[in-house]
A protein has these predicted regions:
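Low-complexity, glycine/proline-biased repetitive segments and flexible coils/loops
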Residues: 1-192
Length: 192
């Protein structure tokens, strides 16, 4: 699942294989929901199948609030500071939540994580005192969330979400009032 942006416009996290994180939004607006997994783990004829998890909550704040992280194949996305419920804050910007972890497989000959969730975008501004980082991508190729434009860790276009890692199937990171990253390409495994 992809991370969500920190923003002033109400929105929701979208459903997917794993759900997207909820956006951060100002107090006085309805608390936005995170996305749900459309293929959660469930029993089947030969064991369980499906590995989706929901996204995390964004921050409900009087200033710019960070978005929640997207769900990964292994764990749900996180809200701010790892909380799984809406947080309120009066701080001058809040970081994004981390993406959920993916699942580990040894199909390549070594243990590798796949399908991590994207990190949520940080909620900040151009004010240098509001230097806010995006959430970390989940283990398994999730993209990092975008930081505020003047974060001390910022590079050009740092407020954009980062793409998921190629061939890992991770979600893209959310932006800081900007574009989110693209999900990383997956892999095809042929057993013979």
């Amino acid at each position: 699942g992809g991370g969500r942006t920190g923003e002033w416009t109400p929105g929701i996290g979208y459903d997917g294989g794993s759900g997207g994180g909820a956006p951060g939004n100002p107090t006085g607006q309805p608390i936005p929901s995170f996305g749900q997994a459309t293929q959660p783990q469930q029993p089947g004829d030969s064991g369980s199948y499906g590995f989706g998890n929901p996204g995390g909550y964004g921050v409900h704040t009087t200033n710019d609030g960070g978005g929640g992280g997207g769900g990964g194949a292994g764990t749900a996305g996180q809200g701010i500071s790892g909380h799984s419920y809406p947080q309120t804050s009066s701080a001058a910007g809040t970081p994004g939540g981390n993406g959920g972890a993916g699942k580990q497989y040894d199909i390549s000959g070594s243990q590798v994580y796949y399908a991590g969730g994207g990190g949520g975008g940080g909620g900040g501004s151009d004010n240098p005192l509001w230097s806010i980082t995006g959430g970390q991508g989940g283990q398994g190729g999730g993209g990092f969330g975008g930081a505020s434009a003047r974060s001390p860790h910022a590079v050009t276009n740092a407020y954009h979400g980062h793409d998921g890692v190629a061939n890992r199937g991770g979600g893209g990171g959310g932006g800081d009032n900007s574009n989110g990253g693209s999900g990383g390409s997956g892999i095809v495994i042929v057993k013979y």
